[in-house]
Amino acid sequence: MTPMTKVHEDRPVLPTQQDEVAAAGSELIGGPLGRYARLGGHWLGPVRVVALVAIGMFALGMVQKLPCYEWAWFQGATSQYTHACYSDIPHLYAVRGFADNLTPYFDRIPGDMEYLEYPVLTGLFMEIASWLTPGSGTMQHREQMYWMVNAGMLMACAAVIAVCVARTHRRRPWDALLFALAPAFALTATINWDLLAIALTAAGMLMWSRGRTVLFGVLIGLATAAKLYPVLLLGVLFVLCWRAGKWRAFGGAVLGAAGAWLVANLPVMVLAWEGWSKFYTFSQERPIDFGSVWLLISQRSGNPLHDANTYATGLTLLLCGAIGLLALTAPRRPRFAQLAFLVVAAFILCNKVYSPQYVLWLIPLAALARPRWRDFLIWQAGEVVYFLGIWFYLAYINSGDKHQGLPVEGYQVAIAAHLLTTLYLCAVVVRDVLLPEHDVVRRDGSDDPSGGVLDGAEDVFVLSDAARAPREAAPSEGQRVDWGTGPRD
C-alpha cells in the first residue's frame, strides 16, 4: 500500500469521468464533461439539476398512472392491474373514511378495518390531503382529486429527498441522480405515502453528515412516526459509534429521536389508544403476503407457514447481528450509508410482505452506499420485473376463468428477481466494506462523507486483528486521504 497523501481539492466528483455507464449515458446530452471544463458560477448547479430531474421523473410516473386516473381505478376488476397503474391512494380515500370526514384513529371506520392502519404522521399527511380535496362532485372525481393532491405533496417530498441526497456527500452531488433517474422511483412514487418517511430520513442523514446529531435524531423520530423502518438507522449508529467511541453523539441522536417520536405519538396514544395501536397490531397479525420470500416458500412447498412472524423476526435479528459483527471486524470502519443500506435491505428481505413501493426505502441509501450505475441498474431491473409481475399476477387471480395476466409460476420468477438482485447489491456493498479499495466513495481519499462525527474518527473498539491494523499515517489536517490505488469497480 502506498503512503497516504492529503487531498486538498474540493472539486466535485464527476461520475462521467469515473463510471463507464454514466459516461456512455451522457452521450445523449453531449458527452462527458472535459477535464478542463469550468465548474461553478451558474445558478443551475448540481443540486438544482438533481431536484429538477427528480421532479421530472416523478411527473413521468404520474403520466404512467394516467389510464388509471381516467378510468381504470373505477371500472373493471383487472384494468388497473393490466395497465400496471394501481395506487392505494384513491381507494383508501373512501374506504378509510376520509371521504366521510372521519377523523383518523379517533373515529371507527365501517368495515373490516376498524381504524386507519398507518402510523400517526402518515395519517396526518393523509388527513391534510383530504382537507385540500374538494368535497363536491361525484365520488370518482373526489378520488381523482385526492390522488392529485397527494401526488403534489409527494412530489415535494421527492424534491426534498433529491436535495438531501445530493448534499449529503459534499463532493459527490451527482450521485443523487441515481435516485432521481431510478425507474422504480418513477413507477412507485404515488402508490402509497412512503415518500414522506423517506424525505424525513434523507433530511436526517444530511443533518448527521453535518454533525447535527440531535436534529438528526429529531428527524429520524418523526420519520419513525411515519414509517417503522427509519428507527433501524439508530441501530446502525449504535455499532458505528461503539467502534469510534462517539457515545455522546449517539446519545444525542437517541434522545432527539425518542422525544420527537413521543411528541408526534403521545397525544393520539393517550386519547385514542385503540386507533393508535392499530398499525402495530395489524403489522403483527398480518399473515405472509405478496412479494415476500415467505410467500415464495409457502407457494412452492404448500406449507402455509403460520409461524412466519417468528421466522421473519428471527432471521431479521440474525442478519442485523451479522451486519453488526461485520461493522466491528471490517478492516476499516464501514461508512454510515453502507450499513444503513444493508440493515434496511435485511429488514425488507425478511419481511412478511413486500409491497412494490418498498423499493423507495432503499433507493436513496443505495445512491449513497454504492454510487455505481452498473450495479444500481442491475438491481433496478429486478425491481421493475417485480413491479410488473405483481400487477399482472393480481390481474390473473382477479380475472376468473379468463386467466388474464401472469400465473403463479411467473409471479414466483418476479419475486426471485427482486430477491436475487437485492442480494446482489447487498453482496457488492459487503465486498466494499471488506475490501475498502473497491469503494468508489473512498477512492479520492474520503473516509465517510455521510458519517458526520464519524468521518475521520479513530477506532476505539474492534473485534478482529484486521480491524486493529494501524493506518499508514493519519493525515495532519483534513479528513480525506488518498490510498494511491488505481480505479476499481
PLM ranges: what are they?
Residues 270-314, 324:
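Periplasmic/ER-lumenal interhelical loops and adjacent helix-loop junctions
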Residues 2-276, 313-489:
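Multi-pass membrane glycosyltransferase architecture that uses lipid-linked
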